[in-house]
Amino acid sequence: MQSGNKFTTFWFNGQKYLSQDMEFTIFDLLNYFDYNPSLLVVEYNNSILIKKNWNKIVILNNDKIEVLTIVGGG
């Protein structure tokens, strides 16, 4: 019997990532990369996500996540 290694390939801000044997949410990913959630807009598979759903959506194989940072200026 082969080991149960499960790989998930996903795209984050245009870069390809590979995760092994780990399930994580959009919120987990943002924390890992040290983003400040109060200043972000997240696009998930070409749709803008509501912030309250970031902790509910588990990243799946071939998902595409883009993070837009809001900055002030004049």
Model feature map: region roles:
Residues M1-G73:
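Ubiquitin-like/PB1-type beta-grasp interaction modules and other compact soluble beta-rich domains
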